[in-house]
Amino acid sequence: MPEPLPLFPLNTPLVPGLVLPLNIFEPRYRAMVQELLDEPRDEAREFGVIAIREGRDPLREGTEALYAVGVSALLRQAEELEDGRFEIVTTGHRRFRLISVEPVPTGAAGAHSGDVTPADPDHDAGLASPAPLLRAQVEFLAEATSESDALLADQVAARFREYRSALGGQVQATVGEDEIPHDPTVLSYLVTAAMVVPQQERQQLLSADSTAARLTIARGMLSRETVLISELSAVPSLDIPGATPSVN
C-alpha cells in the first residue's frame, strides 16, 4: 500500500499547474513542511490540497467533510522565518480521489494564502494538544484526452476571451489576450482556476473525468456567466482565489 498523502484542506480547490504561495503557521503543517524538506527527492515533496465542504469539519467528519477530488501540490520553495513559520511556494501537480482519511497525531498545524484559508483555522484554539495532521489514502487520476479536445478548446478559448472582456479585467491570470494556451488540458485547468464561480462549480470542473468533459462544462459556464454580466450587469461578487494561474 502506498504511503498516505498528508492533506492540507483549504476553502477552495487547487488545480494542476496553479502556483500557490502559502504562509504556514500552524504546528501540524510546519511539521509537514519540515517532513517534506527532509525528502531527498524533489518529486517526493508532495502533499494533498483538497477543498472542504462549506460548514463542515474534516477533523470530526473525515472524508464526509471534504470533496472527493483534490490536487497534490509539489513544494518548490520554502523559507523558514525566525518565529518558526514557513513561507512556501507550491505548484498544483496531479489530481487524486480520496479513499480514506485518518487523523495522525503530530506536533504541527495549518496555513493560508491571501483569500485562501485553512479549512479549520480556529480548531486548535480549544485543544489541549495540537490538532492532528490528516493523512489520506488516495487514488491518483489519469487525465483522459480525445480527438475532440482541440475543437472544444478553440470554442472555450473564444468564450473565455468574451468572458474576460465582459468582466473588464477582473479575472486574475498571468496570460495575456494572445497567450491563452493551445493545449486543451492546460486550457481547461486555466479556465477552472480563473472563472469567478461558486466553489461547487469550480469543484465540478476539477472533478470532470476527462479534458473533453471539463471543456464542455466550462463552455456552458462561460456562456452563462458572460450573458449574465453583459445583459443583466450581474458582475460576480465572489472572491477570486489568491493564487496565480500558470500555464507551466
Predicted regions and their residues:
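N-terminal low-complexity, acidic/polar interaction/targeting segments
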Residues: 1-248
